[in-house]
UniProtKB/Swiss-Prot annotation:
EC number(s) from the headed UniProt entry: 3.5.1.98
Modified residues (Phosphothreonine): T457
Catalytic activity, as annotated: N(6)-acetyl-L-lysyl-[histone] + H2O = L-lysyl-[histone] + acetate
Organism of derivation: Drosophila melanogaster
Protein name: Histone deacetylase HDAC1
GO annotation (BP), single: dendrite guidance
């Protein structure tokens, strides 16, 4: 492992992403992605990387993993026609944690499009690190929404990476178990999933130490079940040795890191005690392996801390040091009273004793010893890329272009979007009963009003500062909106790999309980 610090970094962002609104009181706020973007612009980080507007993923791209019927449902459902879809909403688990809101399908298209385009960029060796903070929606299943996630952009990105890379490692540092990604690849030895998460009476209720994969995928699912209060030192003490052993044993050709920020201290739904620096150390450590590296977002419900975290981790990817003093930005008042980048841990007790963590580590090392070193994989003919960068449909944008007033007028922020009084953050009430932080779904559970933002706030988006929709000082090519994948051949041609998770959402202990089917992976 060498530490070559400077790498080519590509960053995917669409300025519309912050307009989507899950509804009053819902903890998931896509606006955090716009806050992150604005902060990294004002730090000047945009000058150091290529910035692309992602294409909107097509239905054909989404059905590389998701069922045709589920994607058709997502395309059709709207707040004004929900009454026509009552049975399907129940079947696809849409309506509570995963509400129907204006632009739902387009939101899914942008999230998935960024991760797929990033994977294509890595496959073409046009970048060493790609970032999509709008992705990381790790709970979505083949035919089911779950935990605020509708389309699993991570699975789609990994399937794209598998066209060129024999083995892909997925690492998840969200406070919640990465169940959707694990389930999708539970029976293959080409993808290893490693999830560090809170376990025990906590959503989604999966991710036991004994859940290790099935069939050819046995021992290729790695779960690190943690307790409340996980702090920086404890996290590093288990993350570094486990990822080191995984790298040595699995020898991946590419890595995907889900950077869920709900593992930070003070998160509205989380229960860990990590600082931004402690969270960022995971990015720093994985980066040192010099592998094609896809970084995606995920959870994070104290949104000022989410934007702090992802801005800092963008700087880590770029190997650029940034000041602790926050630059003035469009959301500056929400970072008070200190207006600093880094946050301090709370005084909560760390319930993860060194003995407990050592026991977990030793058990996982025993499992990893069962693996052959660098399993051989027969690579078939490489299918066409999901994105054709050289088509005439390229969306060329200039970083320093100012958007027209009509685009400004579309940007609306609901009242109280950032208010601590709405349960958010340090010192606020933490009434999470109706949300995933407190819900535990059955482990083998089978799938069985307009929320549009309505008013502008005084914190109107200032597009003059949004210079980041292109490459620095020159035009940057956005991904083509046309997919070249043929959905009729998707089962056979995804580099011999298609994730075929069963539609259930649970995870079993040991072999066979996932219901994932193997299909040439």
């Amino acid at each position: 492992m060498q530490s070559h610090s400077k790498k080519r970094v590509c960053y995917y962002y669409d300025s519309d992403i912050g307009n989507y609104y899950y509804g009053q009181g819902h903890p998931m706020k896509p606006h955090r992605i716009r806050m992150t973007h604005n902060l990294l612009l004002n730090y000047g980080l945009y000058r150091k990387m290529e910035i692309y507007r992602p294409h909107k993923a097509t239905a054909d791209e989404m059905t590389k993993f998701h069922s045709d019927e589920y994607v058709r449902f997502l395309r059709s459902i709207r707040p004004d026609n929900m009454s026509e879809y009552n049975k399907q909403m129940q079947r696809f688990n849409v309506g509570e944690d995963c509400p129907v809101f204006d632009g739902l399908y387009e939101f899914c298209q942008l999230s998935a499009g960024g991760s797929v385009a990033a994977a294509v960029k890595l496959n073409k060796q046009a970048s060493e690190i790609c970032i999509n903070w709008g992705g990381g929606l790790h709970h979505a299943k083949k035919s089911e929404a779950s935990g605020f996630c509708y389309v699993n952009d991570i699975v789609l990105g990994i399937l794209e990476l598998l066209k060129y890379h024999q083995r892909v490692l997925y690492i998840d540092i969200d406070v919640h178990h990465g169940d959707g990604v694990e389930e999708a690849f539970y029976t293959t030895d080409r993808v290893m999933t490693v999830s560090f998460h809170k376990y025990g009476e906590y959503f989604p209720g999966t991710g036991d130490l004994r859940d290790i994969g099935a069939g050819k995928g046995k021992y290729y699912a790695v779960n690190i079940p943690l307790r409340d209060g996980m702090d920086d030192d404890a996290y590093e003490s288990i993350f570094v040795p486990i990822i080191s052993k995984v790298m040595e044993t699995f020898q991946p050709a590419a890595v995907v890191l889900q950077c869920g920020a709900d593992s930070l201290t003070g998160d509205r739904l989380g229960c860990f005690n990590l600082t931004v620096k402690g969270h960022g150390k995971c990015v720093e450590f994985v980066k040192k392996y010099n592998l094609p590296f896809l970084m995606v977002g995920g959870g994070g419900y104290t949104i000022r801390n989410v934007s702090r975290c992802w801005t800092y981790e963008t700087s880590v990817a770029l190997a650029v040091e940034i000041a602790n003093e926050l630059p003035y930005n469009d959301y500056f008042e929400y970072f008070g009273p200190d207006f600093k980048l880094h946050i301090s841990p709370s005084n909560m007790t760390n319930q993860n004793t060194s003995e407990y963590l050592e026991k977990i580590k030793n058990r996982l090392f025993e499992n990893l010893r069962m693996l052959p070193h660098a399993p051989g994989v027969q690579i078939q003919a490489i299918p066409e890329d999901a994105i054709n960068d050289e088509s005439d449909d390229e969306d060329k944008v200039d970083k320093d272009d100012r958007l027209p007033q009509s685009d400004k007028d579309k940007r609306i922020v609901p009242e109280n979007e950032y208010s601590d009084s709405e349960d958010e953050g340090e010192g606020g009430r933490r009434d999470n009963r109706s949300y995933k932080g407190q819900r535990k779904r059955p482990r083998l559970d089978k799938d069985t009003n307009s929320n549009k933002a309505s008013s502008e706030t005084s914190s109107e988006i200032k597009d003059e500062k949004e210079k980041g929709d292109g490459a620095d000082g020159e035009e940057s090519t956005a991904s083509n909106t046309n997919s070249n994948n043929n959905s009729n051949n998707k089962s056979d041609n995804d580099a011999g790999a298609t994730a075929n998770a069963g539609s259930g959402s649970g995870s079993g202990s040991g072999a066979g309980a996932k219901g994932a089917k193997e299909n040439n992976i």
